[in-house]
């Protein structure tokens, strides 16, 4: 069989065999096999050319995908599958990309940890879930997370949360809110507890008084339409207690309010 045409088509070349069969190849394929018009090739050579062409095309696709940002092995694999690259060829491409240091899931995890250390606010649990979603093996993630100290990140995050909620919640509710927010961000209960102990959460009687009367106004409008006297007082007491106010503060506020 003979190559009867080689025609450039944007980033690929269209090759024609015996004026009948057509398929696309990369420039690397032309160079590798020294292909040219009228060159005679054997059937087994044709299959080798096709396989190499898909490998070359797939690797170029992967490198293009990696040029935008760091990716995991699973992300690159899925990208190549979406572009109809043969699964056997994909395995070969991934192997070569790892050998050439274009792909490294361990380095990917380390970069995520360093970014989180310097500018993030997530604990180990949330980071693990995000890394799992990227297709990284659970054992590799756990091996790299187990020796990483999240305490400084937890304390820094707790300080930011304190500034956000301190003027909005009474002390008891504030501690519960901070602990809940920290565990939601992926920190362990122990890390959250240590971070809260490190914070300087002071009693602010003026702020708490302002908060309790503000909440009392709100709850009174809600319950006074349905209840009165003892039942109303009970409803207000229960509602304010759920908001984290101390019973002594609630009793004093109700004495003046009602």
Swiss-Prot record:
Record's keyword terms, sorted: Cytoplasm
Principal cellular location given in the protein's record: cytoplasm
GO BP: any one term: regulation of DNA repair
Any Pfam family the entry gives: RecX_HTH3
Cytoplasm found in the keyword field: yes
UniProt subcellular location: Cytoplasm
One annotated Gene Ontology cellular component of this protein: cytoplasm
Domain of life assignment: Bacteria
Family per record: Belongs to the RecX family.
PANTHER family in the record: REGULATORY PROTEIN RECX FAMILY PROTEIN
Protein's job: Modulates RecA activity.
Stated name of the protein: Regulatory protein RecX
Species: Streptococcus mutans serotype c (strain ATCC 700610 / UA159)
